């Protein structure tokens, strides 16, 4: 699993049928201190995350399982919206 911050939404009206009508989000990965690390990606989201929110992601076959379709071309899927992150006894993020 990975942590990321949602930086935007992608509108794609023509897409593979395996993606249905799920929302596509632009996300930036977060390092252990909670800072964006510059790695951007597109994740499928069917739980309703919004811009600026921290999210928990899964990739590969786990993303396809989370999307409930082993045959869809999904490589990154939002599985949670983060409320709080504590690392080393310190709160590094609180919604």
From Swiss-Prot:
Q: Which PROSITE patterns match?
A: BMV
What's an example GO BP annotation here?
Answer: protein hexamerization
| Pathway annotation | Amine and polyamine degradation; ethanolamine degradation
* Keyword annotations: Bacterial microcompartment
A UniProt-annotated Pfam family: EutN_CcmL
Task: Name any GO cellular component annotation.
Answer: bacterial microcompartment
Asked whether the UniProt record includes Cytoplasm among its keywords, one would answer: no
* GO molecular function annotation: identical protein binding
Q: Which residues form the BMV domain?
A: 1-83
Entry keyword Signal? no
- Signal sequence span is none
Disulphide-bridged cysteine pairs: none
Quote the subcellular location field of this record: Bacterial microcompartment
Question: How is the quaternary structure described?
Answer: Has been crystallized as a homohexamer with an acidic central pore with a diameter of 26 Angstroms on one side and 14 Angstroms on the other. In solution has been shown to be a pentamer.
Function summary: Probably forms vertices in the bacterial microcompartment (BMC) dedicated to ethanolamine degradation. It may be involved in transporting positively charged molecules into and out of the BMC.
Q: Which family does it belong to?
A: Belongs to the CcmL/EutN family.
What PANTHER family does the annotation carry?
A: BACTERIAL MICROCOMPARTMENT SHELL VERTEX PROTEIN EUTN, ETHANOLAMINE UTILIZATION PROTEIN EUTN
Q: What is this protein called?
A: Bacterial microcompartment shell vertex protein EutN
Species of origin: Escherichia coli (strain K12)
Gene coding for it: eutN
């Amino acid at each position: 699993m990975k942590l990321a911050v949602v930086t935007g939404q992608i509108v794609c009206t023509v897409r593979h049928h395996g993606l249905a009508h799920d929302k596509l989000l632009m996300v930036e990965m977060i390092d252990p201190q909670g800072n964006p690390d510059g790695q951007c990606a597109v994740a499928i989201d069917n739980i309703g995350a919004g811009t600026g929110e921290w999210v928990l992601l899964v990739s590969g076959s786990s993303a396809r399982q989370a999307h409930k379709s082993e045959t869809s071309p999904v490589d990154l899927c939002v599985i949670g919206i983060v409320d709080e992150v504590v690392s080393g006894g310190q709160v590094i993020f609180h919604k």
